[in-house]
Amino acid sequence: MALLSRTDRSLIAQWWWTIDRWSLAAIATLIVSGVLLTLAASPAVAGRIGVEPLHFVYKQLSFVAPALIVILAVSLAGPRDVRRLALVVYVVSLLLMTAALFVGPEIKGAHRWLLIGPFSLQPSEFAKPAFVVLAAAALAESNRTPGFPGALVAGFVYAAFAGLLVLQPDFGQTMLATVVCIAMFFLAGLQWRWLALFGAAGVGGGVGAYFFVPHVASRVDRYWTAEGDTFQVNTSLNAFTQGGFGGVGPGEGSVKFVLPDAHSDFIFAVAGEEFGLAACTVLIVLFGVIVVRALRHAVEERDHFVQLAASGLATMFGLQAAINIAVTLSLIPAKGMTLPFVSYGGSSTLALALTVGMLLALTRRRAASQRGW
């Protein structure tokens, strides 16, 4: 912004000259890509359910506008404000997740949503970044204050969130939260017994889900044996074959007419078919830019809380993208997880805006970090 001088002391000017503009540009490009891919994929989905062709495009644009406001507002905050915001979001989200278990509609066998007028809300999406920041704050406090049970507090923050995820059930998000928590414990330099405890809990939870939750067992069995209903994965793989390097052209793809979640969970397949390997590579690079730059800032940061929180948020953001892409390419069993900022979805878009807003706030250049609550 040429109009903003480095000597300008206004809030926006200080924000502009301290923000990671490469990450900001990558986030903006992902958001624009998401709208364009929704425009490519969603008319076919809209036709199948009997709504106007641009129904999902208009709705996604209505999500993008407040998401941009959230990114700007949250990225203006300092580390102390990020911690306070995370505490509020975490408590409210867990209360709403609990409410969803009792009054939320059952969708595909799970109680993850709350209906608020014409809108649906998935509280667990908002709890994810809040859980990461609070766990980082607890672990960092134990480093600053001898005797503070940081690992225990962080473990409780994780357990409360993961417990509600299991009750919904949502084993994919539980797995994501567990891996991120283990990574943060490792970065915090805690004893191996804590890592072993979380690792054992993750393995035990996965084995238990396989033996006691039929749809989990079904997905794993389909992946390993390639038997049963593998239509979505096979169709997705065929889309990449059809697309080749340059794609068949915008609007010319066929996968969106047969995949039920072409505009959400399998939007990467639409990108592969219509825009080819080249576009898919660009999307992966954009995710890589955000994650790598955040981790680089974390390495250079002296504040232990900022190190852990930025690393945790970046890991969660990158892992979610990797899981979605891996499912689309049949590298792991199917799991309904959105591609950040690219897949259609209101709760996902707004929660990811909160995530990257916190990440941008924590990685801003500042003279000294704010400590304490």
Region annotations inferred by a language model:
Residues 24-40, 46-232, 269-327, 354-358, ...:
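Hydrophobic alpha-helical transmembrane segments of multi-pass inner membrane proteins, especially
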Residues 1-16:
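Short, Lys/Arg-rich, polar N-terminal cytosolic tail immediately upstream
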Residues 226-267, 275-279:
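TM-adjacent membrane-interface loops and short helices in multi-pass inner/ER membrane proteins
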Residues 117-127, 167-169, 244, 248, ...:
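Glycine/serine-rich anion-binding loops at beta->alpha junctions
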Residues 1-4, 325-373:
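A juxtamembrane structural motif centered on a specific transmembrane helix
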Residues 170-175, 247-252, 262-264, 277, ...:
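Transmembrane helix boundary and interhelical junction motifs in multipass membrane proteins
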Residues 7-11, 49, 53, 155, ...:
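Juxtamembrane loop-helix boundary motifs flanking transmembrane segments in multi-pass membrane proteins
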